[in-house]
């Protein structure tokens, strides 16, 4: 994971991070990274310090996803089945594309990218602020990678995991309903004809 950060940042940005950590007041928070959380307020994602805090923040995010934003839950699930080749040693190109795809899908998915990154055996919770800053620097691109890219990668690199998720998606149930109605209309055309 440290290789990700070394490749990820330009030298000037690395110097900024180093200077921030050397300041007498410790790391300076560049801004608060939040999502709409529980009634007690929003969690500052950039201040997560350990696996338990990350898990709590992720669960809070998942519990607050509205039914209208079902695609956010689906993309979280597809992201979880991406294999280690997307977040492990030497995976920078794939790892950064996952970040771009999540950002292009929704700015709310920062917590998903951090949880995904934390799957790396070398993940350091002290880099979460840096990941938040990196996320903030991603520009959304209309023609860029999106949630559809993550679904494609999951299908290519973990077909059984992706299929298990697909069978629990709203899209799957809509397709099943449409196919059943269409099959019924073909089998019984007189019942569907208007007269």
Residue ranges and their predicted role:
Residues 116-120:
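Substrate/cofactor-recognition hotspot
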Residues 67, 105, 142:
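Catalytic cores of large soluble enzymes that bind and process phosphate-bearing ligands
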Residues 122-125:
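Contiguous ligand/interfacial binding patches
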Residues 73, 86-115, 155-195:
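N-terminal nucleic-acid engagement/recognition segments and initiation subdomains in replication
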Residues 14, 30, 42-45, 72, ...:
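Low-complexity, intrinsically disordered short peptide segments enriched in small/polar/basic residues
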Residues 127-171:
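Death-fold interaction domains
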Residues 1-83, 151-157:
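DNA replication initiation modules
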Residues 50, 71-75, 95, 109, ...:
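Alpha-helical structural motif
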